[in-house]
Amino acid sequence: MSRAITRAQLDKLVRSITKFYPQKYADKSWDNTGLLIDCSTAQVTTADANAKTKVLLTVDLTKSVAQEAVDANCNVIVAYHPFIFPSWNRLSPHTNPQHETAIKLIQYGISVYCPHTAVDAARGGVNDWLVRGLNNGENVAKSYALETVSGETDDLIGYGRFVEFNKDISLEQIVKNVKRVLRVPYVQVASLAAPSAWNQLKIKKVAVCAGSGSGVFKQLKEDVDLYYTGEMSHHEVLKWKEMGKTVIVCNHSNTERGFLQDVMKGLLQDEGHEVVVSKMDCDPLTVA
């Protein structure tokens, strides 16, 4: 049975998303954001008019997540990362599992919206969530975006964050806070200090970027003690460590996934939508 909703219902959901994460914030120079699969219909029934749109939130739209949406009778998947990336010139489901998933979702009438860098850049978006998680939202002297969005005057609208604490925090405490807010049992840390000395290593200024921070960190204009991101190249990690800096990397999607449960779910529920967070979505890398 088709899960397709009316155009009016889908438009309402898109308005709810863009209310918090406007499309103009997305980095269109490379990112593929917005409504990537539109299965809405012009036909309206009494049941349609009274029904809530059921939304599944996920970071990555994989085959297992798509099946989860089908099984849960969801109408729309909001996938943080762009599902169609880079652009497709043809569909070949026999050689590309993403193409197979797209065809399946269309057959079931499930639409897909991907906000990605619009959420990265928004005030109150994923980067501000990461900043709050460093010390429970307390002790922040100042914070601003490392790379602002063109045309915006608010210095908290943009990619990445610089944050300075009122009072130093030990690396040991920051690592504990990061693992708690990201819901991960481990992170990777590069530091000249041995782990036994992390309680003595004080952190006051931090560069933060969800996902991959390498490009955004090039916009830094102030010196920092700590670089905190999802992933960074080996040579960059080595460079910062040799310069006496500390690096925390957590795997790309681990810096984004908890935001769906902690922030986005509640915002969309308050807008009148039924929202569930995927249980199948997970970082593709595990420790063996």
From Swiss-Prot:
Belongs to the GTP cyclohydrolase I type 2/NIF3 family. The keyword Cell membrane does not apply. Its main location: mitochondrion. Present with 6000 molecules/cell in log phase SD medium. It is found in: Mitochondrion. May interact with NGG1. Gene3D superfamilies: NIF3 (NGG1p interacting factor 3)-like. This is NGG1-interacting factor 3. Keywords: Mitochondrion.
